[in-house]
Amino acid sequence: MNGIDDLLNINDRIKQVQNERNELASKLQNLKQSLASNDTEVALSEVIAQDIIEVGASVEGLEQLRAKYGDLQILNKLEKVAVQQTQMQAGVDKLDSFERQLDELAEQPPDQFTLDDVKALHSKLTSVFATVPQINNIDSQYAAYNKLKSKVTGKYNDVIIQRLATNWSNTFDQKLLEAQWDTQKFASTSVGLVKCLRENSTKLYQLSLLYLPLEEETQNGDSERPLSRSNNNQEPVLWNFKSLANNFNVRFTYHFHATSSSSKIETYFQFLNDYLAENLYKCINIFHDDCNGLTKPVIHEQFINYVLQPIRDKVRSTLFQNDLKTLIVLISQILATDKNLLNSFHYHGLGLVSLISDEVWEKWINYEVEMANRQFINITKNPEDFPKSSQNFVKLINKIYDYLEPFYDLDFDLLVRYKLMTCSLIFMNLTSSYLDYILTVDSLNETRTKEQELYQTMAKLQHVNFVYRKIKSLSSNFIFIQLTDIVNSTESKKYNSLFQNVENDYEKAMSTDMQNSIVHRIQKLLKETLRNYFKISTWSTLEMSVDENIGPSSVPSAELVNSINVLRRLINKLDSMDIPLAISLKVKNELLNVIVNYFTESILKLNKFNQNGLNQFLHDFKSLSSILSLPSHATNYKCMSLHELVKILKLKYDPNNQQFLNPEYIKTGNFTSLKEAYSIKYLKDTKIQDALYRIIYGNIL
């Protein structure tokens, strides 16, 4: 007790303690009940587990437990496992029985079997497989079943399929050779013979479809294939097509086996082409059997596929040779043959190009790059060949592209890398090298003239433009559009073309470097011819009336005639060149600016003029500038400003507007009214002010 208040509240405190004691007692009671319940559940679980051990191994025992304990989840799971084990054991028993049957059948001669017998065996075996469930957790029982399944399947394929296929196909091979079905001697009108051959083909085809793939074959991809599997893909051997291709195989071996060392590679592929051209559609017509799956498209594809086999073998053996020349010829023939198979025979199966390894592709690419560079050097090494360099270069590009086109036409994902390599190492590299060559080549001798140097620059521009158009055409070919899309997709780029950077370099060379060089060279030549014209000092004393416009009544100053002739010759040469119109117009526009500058700075500002002098000045300017033949609708700011400047200077001779010559008016610098009166649009106010001062200071007489 701490005080009187605690003493007064003693009853409340006693009640609180009693409540806490009751609550604690309740919790203790609940805990005792929970522990007792847990003990009961544990005891029950132990009882159930013991019952499962004793009777839960069978479906019947599990049903008894379900009746006793209810629908427990563990019982459902155990029942599922029991059912699977029962089915699996039944499958094992059936496979054991089937294996014994196969052992018995192995003793029977092949001629005692019919196709229906094989179909029945196939159906029986596949039905056994279907009754055994697929499970994720592989236990020892399932592993044993799978082992037995593979053993029985392999024995079925060997004892039944392989043995019968070999026997029946040997017989069919002989019939086909005797019938000479792939020669002109074949009597296609013999209905009985055609029917017999077709039935034999169909029987072998149906037998091929009864082959059962082993589990590891479907999982391991390119692992070792059994004899009854095709050696060029993962499909089972179609024995009828192997027989149909046997005649070609015999002929091919006869012609090329003994003389393989002396036969040109090209003859192998020509022999193939001739054989298919003669016999493909004959084979389709004779052996198609739509009712049994041998449709015309199937025969079309598979006949070519099997006829290709000896060619594949020949290609493989040749690819192992170390002779680079032979290798290059072989690849060229492979590319051409695959393209021909696609375009001429509409074959979409696995072509010969699939036989070429990465190592061989690398050798081929390196060789083609080396040859392309060597040919490029040949057409650019002699400066005297400069005049025809662009034509020779484009011929080289066309030749290389035509050679590579069969390679580009092959739709084979693994070839994308090599297609990109040819684009980069050959086409992009060569076009860049040609631009470097053009920018540095000098075909002139030491006694050159400035005009010859100008013409060489014009010729360079023409060559670059010619090749530039070829690059644009090349980049629009489907293969390069396709490769651009691939690069953009894989590298997250937005190239318009793989040649984009090369095109930009060509455009810069033309529109900046060469264009400016041409303007500069013409400017220097023109300035040289204008020396005497700049010395004229009689502009203020001319007495003969002159029409400022070009016409028969007026002639340019004698000192300007040579400049006119030279500029005309240079512009005619420029117009004769095959260069972009935009660049030609820019060159002429820049030359017009040069002419305006010469006439303004070297003549108009440095001399006094009378009215005839101004007219002669303007006539001379028009005579020289008109040679440029710029479009009439084209507006040149400097040219228009010069015309307006002369118009202002002629105000001296306009008695109706002398108020514009008032010094106070001129001093204001505000010439709005004057501009309206004389339709001045381009000349700046400062230039107008200078012109008006020239008038009142006596420079215009």
From Swiss-Prot:
It comes from the Eukaryota. GO terms for cellular component: cytosol; Dsl1/NZR complex; endoplasmic reticulum; endoplasmic reticulum membrane. Its main location: endoplasmic reticulum. It is found in: Endoplasmic reticulum membrane. Pfam families: RINT1_TIP1. The keyword Nucleotide-binding does not apply. Residues 147-701 form the RINT1/TIP20 domain. PROSITE patterns: RINT1_TIP20. It is a peripheral membrane protein. Keywords: Endoplasmic reticulum, ER-Golgi transport, Membrane, Protein transport, Transport. Transmembrane segments: none annotated. GO terms for biological process: autophagy; endoplasmic reticulum to Golgi vesicle-mediated transport; protein transport; regulation of ER to Golgi vesicle-mediated transport; retrograde vesicle-mediated transport, Golgi to endoplasmic reticulum. Present with 6020 molecules/cell in log phase SD medium. Required for protein transport between the Golgi and the endoplasmic reticulum. May contribute to tethering of coatomer-coated retrograde transport vesicles to the ER membrane through interaction with and stabilization of the SNARE complex. Component of a peripheral membrane protein complex consisting of DSL1, SEC39/DSL3 and TIP20. Bound to a SNARE complex consisting of UFE1, USE1, SEC20 and SEC22 or YKT6 through direct interaction of TIP20 with SEC20. Interacts with DSL1, SEC39/DSL3 and the cytoplasmic domain of SEC20. PANTHER family: RAD50-INTERACTING PROTEIN 1 (PTHR13520:SF0), RAD50-INTERACTING PROTEIN 1 RINT-1 (PTHR13520). This is Protein transport protein TIP20. The lineage of its organism: Eukaryota, Fungi, Dikarya, Ascomycota, Saccharomycotina. The gene is TIP20.
